[in-house]
A protein has these predicted regions:
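Conserved N-proximal alpha/beta basic substrate-recognition cap immediately N-terminal to
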Residues: 1-94
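Short, well-ordered alpha-helical microsegments
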Residues: 3, 49-52, 104-105, 164-167
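Active-site nucleotide/adenylate-binding loops and adjacent lid/helix of ATP-dependent enzymes
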Residues: 32, 59-62, 70-155, 206, ...
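Protein kinase-like catalytic core scaffold
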Residues: 115, 156, 178-179, 224, ...
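Phosphate-binding site of ATP-dependent enzymes
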Residues: 129-219
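A long amphipathic alpha-helix within ATP-dependent nucleotide-binding catalytic cores
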Residues: 189-238, 259-272
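Glycine-rich phosphate/pyrophosphate-binding beta-alpha loops
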Residues: 242-255
Length: 272
């Protein structure tokens, strides 16, 4: 859910909303202007590279954009996300970065199996793998080394959090946390809806709200999807932050109009 729904809701609110497709977006470096009268851009490109670059270009034109390119960098690069949050004492899964397979294997042993290896950039749970022992880890490391990943020689390795068969997705819009979901997967340890997890309504308690807003203050941005694990001993752990969050399943199970809420809050923000 994204551009089309935002346009429909914008019309209902009396706003003039249109979609600019990245495939049609061309900007010369010496011609910083857009013909239309624009107050705000909302980034909905599911391609990280295109989202990052188009947000950057729009900012150079002098327009506000949700989200700005620096927020997207901090969100979409898992190394940046994890280490920035950890520096600010946000609870996160234990993670290390290695630039060599030997070190990756050595420190995985110290971390303790099973471990999870993730691509530095990516979404929907793609290429996220659990290694139960050294042999399995070596296979994953070797596969990554010869893949076409952008960061194929940088290894992002994380503890396996023994969470319930679910995780939490909370949406932050402006300074509010209006809605969230549980993502439950009975058949896979990965709880992405793209991998078969089902969405269920979430009642956001004060602890979750406070944590999500702290993350927003650290990462920046206006519209975020924050993924949180529940650990029986440590409580809530922030796993990832999405700078262009999808929300179709959240709307469906909560009967909450995210597009309308986002547009109203965005207009308030621009007017300030």
């Amino acid at each position: 859910m994204g551009g089309k729904n935002l346009i429909e809701e914008g019309k209902k609110l009396g706003y003039q909303v249109t979609t600019i497709y990245s495939k049609d977006f061309v900007l010369f470096s010496n011609e910083f202007n857009i013909e239309n009268d624009v107050n705000l851009f909302i980034q909905r490109n599911i391609s990280h590279n295109r989202a990052l670059i188009t947000s950057f270009l729009v900012e150079q034109l002098g327009y506000p954009v949700i989200n700005d390119h620096m927020t997207l960098i901090r969100c979409e690069n898992k190394i940046f996300t994890t280490y920035i949050l950890a520096k600010h004492n946000i609870p996160t899964p234990k993670t290390f970065i290695a630039f060599d397979k030997t070190n990756a294997m050595e420190y995985s042993k110290k971390l303790g199996y099973p471990v999870v290896i993730k691509p530095v950039e990516g979404s929907w749970g793609r290429m996220v793998a659990k290694a139960d022992n050294l042999d399995v880890l070596y296979s994953y490391l070797e596969y990554q080394e010869f893949s076409t990943q952008k960061y194929k020689d940088i290894y992002y390795i994380q503890e396996f959090v023994n969470k319930p068969n679910r995780d939490i997705r909370i949406f932050v819009i402006g300074d509010e946390t209006p809605v969230g979901i549980y993502r439950v997967n009975e058949n896979n340890w990965r709880t992405n809806t793209a991998l078969g997890a089902k969405a269920y309504p979430l009642k956001i308690d004060e602890e979750l709200k406070e944590l999500a807003l702290k993350v927003k203050d650290i990462i920046g941005g206006f519209f975020l999807g924050i993924d949180i694990f529940e650990d029986k001993d440590r409580g809530y752990l922030v796993d990832e932050v999405n700078g262009v969050p999808e929300y179709k399943n959240t709307v469906r199970v909560n009967n909450f109009n995210i597009s309308k809420f986002l547009l109203e809050k965005a207009v308030e923000w621009v007017k300030k």
